[in-house]
């Protein structure tokens, strides 16, 4: 290694001519590299090691970033300054740089400030440490940079690890303590966390070597570096195995082990609410583990004996409202984020609480999805009070619930402090500046160590940003727990920081979706989460993926959804974790079969038999693994149609002639618009003309209008009056949500005026149901017509959202429109949103909206006609029942949860209908009433053989 420098002044040259360090030479004495002599400006400082030569100019800008092995120049054109600082909100670049032995002396523009950095060069990285800041106002410096590399690399930019890389080269910045923030290959320190003495390591190496160098830095600089079985956690075999995330207890552990074995999972992780009875104190849940820790340890021991490891799920720093830290007396170390002063004495019954100070910092919304300031709970002395409103003057809490969350209502004196309790996802948080952080860490680590857990999932970690800057505070509780664990540990969680990158073994690709699961996997889990992780050199797994039984807000998991995940698992050579409940696994009739399918794919992935070129093809489209003498993947397509009688559809077959394969399900029939059993959400005498989005409105998803459904008559529907006529959102003042459990389909009568666009896609309107917990279901209408029309929306069309018009987060979180906690029995609003606009935008008026009454369907002897061939199913399908024909003429009949009822042979017996190449006209008819969902399954000819197959 070498640190090559050239002094900035003749005086420094004279001084340094008599001060030589091993491996340090003057710039004019530098040897030629493989690329030849580097032209260096006068006064340059050169940093050189085995992999890279970096030249910093006297003006503080980087002049060269040369890869020595190839002679390639990686520096971005017109780079900025290597150092900077911020004082009183103003940025000052490091515009003058000189070297003094192993120190760099930097002056910052006209700030009157300078800094001294110590430079340490290692064979494959170098370290920059801040030694001092000098000059008038040095104590007013808010932040200062430790350096920034600016490679001309844009292919991959890490968000968690501060790295830029492509297939050839990588540049990375690593803080050497949790008080150093890194981003975009730069490092920053801040006054509030301490600046002098902090260090950052910079790496510029061939990409294939980056992880080796980072592991070396962890070892040489005493950074966290967890190991599993003697291997670095990020590269250990356990990281390649998935896990079953389920409510495992001492009573059901044998069944949980059986399920995990079927899916070939390496771990079972149990929910926080399963092993503990509340968040915060985390008392062992004696219902599930009757002997406390003894039961929990026995359960884990049984998993270990079966060859499985066990993960602990927790919500990082969350404190449940049912926890001893809250009731009967709240712990003073709960996090608070707003303060007011009680204006007058109050007794224990009063429901209006006056404040002597403004309440503009107190939220107006409950704690639902997201990380914004929210929650309606305040603390006065030892009483928690829940408020529902704040008066228009912003000086009084209204409609208060006294003695909330198990506390005791009590009188309070004027002048008492009113604190807002920070709330996320219905829980309070620990104030991480207090001793409660370490108490919680001791508690969790103690259970982990004593009971023999192998993995921890720090869920909800991102919410700790409520304490302060995300990059620092999100790591604090996680690290406090990690540092106390005395076992090999696989760490995952949500909320990553530069410091926790070191302890995390991999990342999970976000929560599961209950609807549009295939699109959610491709357009979010893979395109967003998996790419974000891998761009930061973090291994990833495709969980969490939900496994469902049938519910009003989502169907039961289907075989093609399982295979879709399994295919992507092989394509990306990435494991998957399955989140579900034991109850859902038991209710679903094909659980064993589908877990075995997943396990078969997992074994194939782990075997490494699928060649890279095949895996690359499997990243797109749907595929089916065909076992037999020749194992191969074949393209598969699922075309789904909702039909009433007479039901006709056209099915395309782009492949050779093949047997008709299908899935037929009886679905609820829907009443006609105007039927007295419907629930009127917007009456015809209250039309809504939808205004266009404002020019600066985020798109897609800009709100055009909203109808408050809690103000329907009695909140029960019927012919209730319309509200919300005109533009804008109207908030509820009273009333109850509407139940649409038996009215899930919508009929929208609307009028579209003005010319349609001459070319290109049409405008798209979202008729959105909003539940009282701020979750949604989207229904899209293409405005590709003019005049008046009734559009029937039998079910949500969420599968279009991510491929076509992902909503701007400022409008609504797309995940809130896909999660399973949407409840049709608690619908509070009907929203109209613009998902796509055109020029000119058609004039659109909503004339009425009805929620259509559902009725039971009965499909007797359903018959499918294809050309001149017929297939009759000799059975009756009631609502939810499924007829599955994956093999010619063999029909398996299931209930809505895929429990097998019986197997029948389709008629006639002389052969099954065939799909000819090209378009095929199909007709579906039956005796009885109702509607059907018909899915036609076609296999393609473009097979992908697996090398090594017999």
Locate predicted features:
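Carbohydrate-recognition beta-sandwich/jelly-roll modules
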Residues: 47-268, 272, 290, 298, ...
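Extracellular beta-strand ligand-recognition surfaces/modules
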Residues: 144-147, 660-662, 674-680, 743-748, ...
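Carbohydrate-binding surfaces of carbohydrate-active enzymes
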Residues: 296-320, 334-339, 568, 572-675
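Intrinsically disordered, low-complexity segments enriched in serine, threonine, and glycine
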Residues: 364, 402-405, 410, 414, ...
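Extracellular ligand-binding interfaces
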Residues: 681, 687-690, 694-715, 721-816, ...
């Amino acid at each position: 290694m070498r640190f090559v420098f050239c002094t900035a002044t003749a005086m420094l040259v004279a001084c340094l001519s008599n001060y030589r360090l091993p491996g340090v030479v003057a710039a004019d004495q530098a040897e030629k590299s493989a690329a030849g002599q580097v032209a260096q400006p006068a006064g340059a400082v050169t940093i050189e090691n085995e992999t890279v030569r970096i030249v910093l100019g006297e003006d503080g800008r980087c002049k060269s970033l040369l890869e020595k092995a190839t002679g390639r120049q990686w520096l971005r054109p017109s780079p900025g300054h290597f150092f900077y600082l911020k004082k009183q909100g103003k940025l000052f670049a490091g515009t003058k740089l000189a070297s003094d032995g192993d120190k760099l002396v930097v002056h910052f523009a006209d700030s009157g400030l300078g800094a001294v950095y110590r430079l340490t060069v290692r064979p494959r990285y170098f370290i920059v440490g801040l030694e001092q800041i000098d000059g008038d106002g040095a104590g007013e410096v808010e932040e200062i940079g430790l350096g920034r590399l600016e490679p001309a690399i844009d292919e991959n930019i890490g968000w968690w690890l501060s790295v830029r890389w492509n297939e050839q080269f990588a540049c990375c910045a690593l803080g050497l303590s949790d008080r150093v923030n890194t981003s975009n290959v730069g490092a920053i320190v801040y006054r509030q966390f301490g600046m002098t003495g902090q260090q950052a390591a910079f790496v510029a190496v061939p990409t294939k070597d980056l992880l080796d160098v980072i592991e070396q830095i962890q070892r040489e600089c005493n950074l966290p570096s967890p190991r599993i079985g003697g291997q670095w956690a990020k590269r250990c075999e356990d990281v390649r195995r998935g896990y079953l995330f389920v409510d495992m207890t001492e009573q059901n552990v044998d069944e949980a082990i059986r399920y995990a074995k079927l899916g070939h999972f390496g771990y079972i992780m149990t929910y926080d609410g399963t092993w503990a009875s509340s968040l915060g104190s985390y008392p062992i849940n004696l219902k599930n583990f009757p002997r406390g820790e003894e039961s929990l340890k026995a359960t884990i021991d049984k998993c270990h004996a079966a060859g499985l490891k066990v993960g602990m799920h927790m919500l990082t720093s969350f404190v449940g409202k049912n926890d001893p830290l809250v009731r009967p007396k709240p712990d003073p170390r709960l996090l608070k984020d707003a303060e007011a002063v009680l204006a007058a004495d109050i007794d224990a019954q009063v429901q209006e609480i006056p404040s002597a100070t403004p309440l503009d910092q107190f939220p107006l919304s409950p704690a639902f999805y997201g990380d914004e300031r929210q929650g309606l709970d305040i603390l006065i002395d030892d009483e928690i009070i829940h408020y529902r409103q704040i008066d228009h003057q912003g000086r009084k809490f209204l409609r208060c619930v006294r003695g909330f969350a198990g506390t005791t209502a009590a009188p309070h004196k004027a002048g008492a402090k009113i604190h807002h309790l920070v709330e996320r996802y219905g829980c309070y948080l620990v104030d991480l500046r207090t001793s409660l952080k370490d108490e919680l860490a001791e508690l969790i680590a103690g259970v982990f160590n004593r009971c023999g857990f192998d993995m921890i999932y720090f869920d909800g970690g991102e919410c700790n940003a409520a304490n302060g800057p995300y990059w620092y505070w999100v790591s604090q509780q996680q690290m406090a727990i990690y540092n106390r664990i005395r076992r090999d540990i696989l760490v995952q969680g949500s909320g990553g920081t530069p410091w926790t990158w070191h302890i995390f073994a991999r990342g999970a690709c976000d929560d599961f979706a209950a609807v549009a699961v295939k699109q959610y996997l491709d357009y979010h889990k893979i395109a967003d989460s998996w790419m974000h992780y891998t761009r930061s050199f973090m291994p990833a797994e495709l969980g969490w993926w939900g496994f469902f039984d049938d519910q009003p807000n989502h169907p039961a998991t289907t075989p093609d959804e399982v295979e879709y995940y399994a295919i992507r698992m092989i394509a990306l050579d990435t494991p998957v974790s399955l989140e579900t409940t034991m109850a859902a696994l038991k209710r679903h009739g094909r659980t064993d079969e589908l877990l075995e399918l997943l396990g078969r794919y997992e074994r194939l992935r782990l075997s490494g038999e699928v060649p890279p070129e095949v895996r690359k093809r499997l990243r797109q489209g749907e595929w089916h693994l065909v076992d037999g003498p020749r194992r191969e993947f074949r393209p598969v397509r699922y075309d789904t149609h909702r039909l009433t009688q007479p039901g006709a559809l056209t099915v395309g077959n782009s492949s050779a002639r093949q047997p008709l394969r299908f899935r037929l399900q009886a679905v609820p029939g829907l009443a006609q618009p105007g039927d007295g059993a419907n629930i009127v959400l917007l009456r015809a005498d209250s039309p809504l003309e939808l205004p266009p989005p404002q020019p600066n409105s985020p798109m897609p998803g800009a709100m055009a209008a909203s109808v408050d459904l809690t103000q329907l008559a009695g909140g029960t529907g019927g012919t209730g009056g319309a509200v919300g006529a005109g533009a804008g959102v109207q908030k509820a003042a009273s009333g109850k949500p509407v139940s649409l459990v038996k009215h899930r389909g919508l009929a929208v009568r609307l009028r579209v005026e003005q010319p349609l666009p001459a070319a290109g896609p049409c405008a798209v309107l979202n008729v959105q149901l909003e539940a009282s917990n701020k979750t949604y279901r989207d229904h899209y209408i293409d405005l590709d017509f003019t005049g008046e029309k009734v559009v029937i929306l039998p079910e949500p069309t969420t599968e279009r959202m991510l491929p076509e018009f992902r909503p701007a987060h400022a409008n609504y979180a797309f995940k809130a429109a896909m999660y399973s906690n949407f409840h049709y029995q608690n619908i509070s609003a009907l929203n109209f949103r613009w998902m796509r606009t055109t020029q000119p935008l058609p004039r659109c008026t909503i004339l009425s909206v009805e929620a259509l009454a559902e009725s039971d369907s009965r499909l007797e002897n359903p018959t499918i006609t294809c050309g001149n061939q017929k297939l009759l199913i000799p059975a009756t399908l009631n609502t939810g029942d499924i007829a599955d024909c994956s093999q010619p003429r063999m029909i398996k009949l299931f209930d809505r949860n895929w429990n097998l009822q019986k197997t029948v042979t389709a008629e006639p017996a002389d052969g099954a209908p065939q799909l000819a190449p090209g378009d095929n006209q199909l007709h579906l008819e039956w005796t009885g009433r109702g509607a059907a969902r018909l899915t036609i399954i076609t296999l393609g000819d473009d097979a992908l053989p697996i090398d090594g197959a017999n």
